[in-house]
Amino acid sequence: ILSLMQKLEIQGGKKLVGTINISGSKNATLPILAATILTDKKVIIHNVPSVRDVTTMIELLNEMGSVVKFSAKEKKIEIKNNKSLKTLAPYNLLKTMRAGVLVLGALLAKYKSAKVSLPGGCAIGSRPINLHLIALKKMGAKIKLKNGYVIASAKDGLKGCFYKFPKVSVGATENILIASCF
């Protein structure tokens, strides 16, 4: 391991030239999929990886009423939402992935209510979603936990606010940004 004061010098006989294809990222795709809830326009996403969490999020969106077509061969997703989606994200779909909680902010912003199962599927260990909930409350959401579900409402809509997370949370930041877009 190099310290900050050391350097690594590579001497080679040829300049590097060429192109490489970068594969799509699950961690970029999942919040984009959740954010599609906010629009009734057709959305096309390219360079989508064919991994379990992505296919589970597609199942969730379909269950909620979105029309989602995924071509693993083309690495492309097309999404068109009906005028009104279901605001329930059930346990049977969220039990295997943490990112399902990202639909909470989108549903609250657009429909002013959501019932979202507490997430599962984390190989890293327990990572609570309290930071998501605290920030959404700061934006005006009423939230309660009941029978393994987050039941949230924002009768008057969510309101913009200044909020600084007490610690870094990529997922909570994504959720609040999505919630702030509608």
Predicted regions, residues:
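Structural preference for solvent-exposed beta-strand-turn elements
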Residues: I1-F182
